[in-house]
Regions:
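Surface beta-strand/loop "capping" patches
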Residues: 8, 16-21, 261-265, 285, ...
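Ser/Thr-rich low-complexity repeats and stalk/linker segments
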Residues: 3-4, 9-84, 338-342
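An acidic-aromatic loop/edge-strand motif
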Residues: 3-4, 77-147, 179-259, 327-401
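C-terminal beta-sandwich/jelly-roll accessory domains of carbohydrate-active enzymes
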Residues: 42, 532-602
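Catalytic cores of secreted or luminal carbohydrate-active enzymes
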Residues: 204-210, 218-251, 460-521, 539
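Short, aromatic- and glycine-rich surface loops/edge beta-strands on solvent-exposed regions
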Residues: 64-74, 329-332, 573-579
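Beta-strand-rich ligand-recognition modules
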Residues: 40-63, 290, 297-350
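Aromatic-lined ligand-binding clefts that engage carbohydrates, nucleic acids, or primary amines
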Residues: 25, 273, 277-301, 330-332
Length: 602
């Protein structure tokens, strides 16, 4: 007999979309009657033959006064406490939407915005990879609501929270966030098998991945391979004990950053330093930027931190009493798995306590402890087609939202030529399944990249093209990324720009489209560019012209409400603005002083 339960999202702290009917769902014995008592009314539903029920609650006005929903079924009672009615948003995408508020901490900045608004709540859906083509859950298999004034608030989506805070400060209505973001997920990971099969591009992969036991077999193979690699490192490492004991094995003298090429295995770094007299050692942190791939860090032979992969910043708290007057040693091992690694350029390496610093840039000894063969990367399931559809994306279809916010595209840089098609299909299919024309606000990728291969420029161009989809908007984020970090910390401004787009699209009903170049008028020696609204040029280094496939920089200047380009070589095949991977200093701005999207035009 099926026990009476409510789906996980219908739990304490729930925010329901105002002014529309909401269906509250769960499970009960087939034929059982479920009743809801709320606000003096009673509403009912009956469980179907599969033991599922959908109980319709009529639309309610916005309310910041917490209330209770009381359910009864077969002698059992369930109560959802602390329920609000406001505006609910589906936030999704990759790690930059997933990135929690705690990861936006910048130890070199005095500004750190902490969440503190009880009217903003997030439901974090579990990330569950699934390649079964027939699996499509009606409800999330877990999850809970977090209030932004609670202990767990630092793990809420930073971009999502700052979006919600900006919006809440304007409209003063409770905000709910349903977060299905998954680091590294591709746009095709959020589409069902039958849609992916329409294109033919994914058939070979789907034939393999949809076979029973794919995840289990692949995981076992990966773990076996990675386990053998780790055991080889541990068995061959003869430097750990002497370095941690304070001995000084010979090695290469280096300063940070360090790039290691054509090497897989383990490297040790160590450095001795004097603790300055009067240095406030209590509360100190060891700051080592980011590295590739895995590190374990020590102060005076005691482990203070460990990070298993390349992306997170190495901010390690040093236990009080570990730093001592006089000589100290900082050391860390670095495991390089795939043939290239090192300590990332452009970061700051130091011990910090309050406003006091001990610089750690130079004076390191680098010792190669173990050399191995490059390891084959483990399978990153959630970056694959279909992976986060059936158990992570599909359960959102039955919920009511004000809009969807998506920050996604990094994983699709390698196939940017397909992105417009796949993103458009994602939006179309999502709207068809949820049954209404949900507004969709995308986040264009910011600047990033050590090597300019053009992949992110092409992806941004595809994202701009996706703005042709009706009832969509896009926040332009160049200028607030970090060239040497895939996860820039300025999510406050990301959230603010998303809120501006959302307000225009979903509230003011004016529509919202990024500023576009609407015309090119060629003159002797140059061209006049006109735009969909007045623009302001604050530099001239980002305009280029293409002649016979060769890209040449051209001078630009303000002319009226547009831009004039000097073209001494005549009419080009194409004109580009900021069309490269890392345009970190935007030069063209709209009437709101927001950056204009990179573009190209014939």
């Amino acid at each position: 007999m099926t026990k009476f339960t409510l789906d996980p999202i219908f739990s304490d702290g729930l925010v329901l979309q105002r002014d529309t009917e909401n269906c509250i769902c769960g499970s009960a014995a087939a034929g059982e009657r479920i009743t809801l008592a709320f606000n003096g009314g009673e509403y009912g539903a009956e469980a179907d033959e599969k033991g599922r029920f959908r109980l319709a609650l009529p639309g309610q006005p916005a309310s910041a006064e917490p209330c209770e929903l009381v359910f009864s079924c077969g002698g059992e009672t369930a109560v959802i406490k602390d329920v609000l009615f406001g505006d609910v948003f589906h936030i999704t995408g990759q790690s930059n939407m997933e990135l929690p508020i705690c990861r936006t901490f910048d130890p070199f900045s005095d500004i750190f915005r902490k969440p503190d608004c009880p009217m903003i709540r997030e439901f974090r859906a579990p990330i569950e990879n699934c390649f079964d083509p027939d699996t499509e859950l009606e409800a999330f298999d877990g999850g809970s609501w977090t209030r932004s004034d609670s202990d767990g608030a630092m793990f809420m989506s930073a971009a999502g929270y700052f979006f919600a805070k900006t919006l809440y400060d304007d409209i003063k209505v409770p905000i709910g966030l349903v977060n299905t973001s998954a680091g590294g997920s591709a746009i095709e990971g959020r589409l069902p098998c039958k849609i992916l099969r329409e294109y033919g591009d994914y058939d070979e992969f789907l034939d393999k991945a949809t076979a029973p036991g794919y995840i289990e077999r692949t995981t076992e193979e990966d773990m076996t391979r990675e386990g053998a690699h780790y055991r080889e490192l541990e068995a061959g490492d003869k430097l750990r004990e002497p370095i941690l004991a304070g001995e000084s094995p010979e090695g290469e003298k280096v300063s940070f950053p360090v790039e290691v090429k054509d090497f897989a295995g383990r490297i040790w770094f160590y450095k001795d330093f004097e603790l300055p007299e009067g240095f406030p050692a209590e509360g100190a942190m060891l700051l080592l930027g980011t590295m590739t791939d895995r590190d374990v860090a020590y102060i005076n032979g005691v482990q203070v931190g460990e990070t298993g992969y390349m992306y997170p910043p190495r901010f390690y708290h040093i236990p009080d009493g570990l730093l001592k007057s006089g000589k100290n040693r900082v050391s860390f091992l670095l495991d390089i798995r795939y043939g290239q690694g090192g300590v990332t350029v452009g970061k700051r390496w130091c011990i910090k306590s309050g406003n006091s610093y001990i610089d750690l840039t130079g004076g390191w000894t680098m010792c190669r402890a173990v050399k191995t063969e490059k390891i084959i990367p483990g399978t990153f399931f959630q970056g694959l087609p279909l992976s986060v559809y059936g158990r992570t994306t599909a359960p959102a279809y039955g919920l009511k939202f004000k809009a969807m916010l998506i920050y996604q595209g990094e994983t699709n840089g390698y196939n940017a030529d397909k992105y417009e098609r796949m993103f458009t299909r994602f939006v179309e299919y999502y709207r068809m399944r949820c049954g209404y024309d949900i507004p969709v606000i995308a986040t264009q990728l910011p600047e990033f990249g050590f090597v300019d291969d053009g992949s992110w420029a092409r992806l941004r161009d595809a994202q701009l093209a996706c703005c042709k989809i009706p009832n969509t908007a896009m926040a332009v984020t160049i200028g607030i990324g970090e060239w040497n970090d895939l996860h820039p910390v300025n999510k406050w401004e990301v959230g603010r720009r998303l809120a501006l787009c959302t307000k225009a699209l979903a509230y003011d009903k004016q529509g919202y489209e990024p500023v576009r170049c609407t015309g090119v008028r060629y003159l002797d020696g140059g061209a006049e560019l006109s735009f969909s609204e007045p623009v302001t040029l604050k530099g001239d280094g980002y305009f280029e012209a293409v002649y016979g496939g060769e890209v040449r920089k051209v001078n630009a200047r303000q002319k009226g409400e547009g831009v004039f380009l000097s073209l001494p070589d005549g009419r080009p095949e194409e004109i580009r603005y900021a069309y490269f991977d890392c345009p970190k200093d935007p030069e063209l701005f709209d009437s709101k002083d927001l950056p204009v999207s990179p573009f190209r035009t014939k």
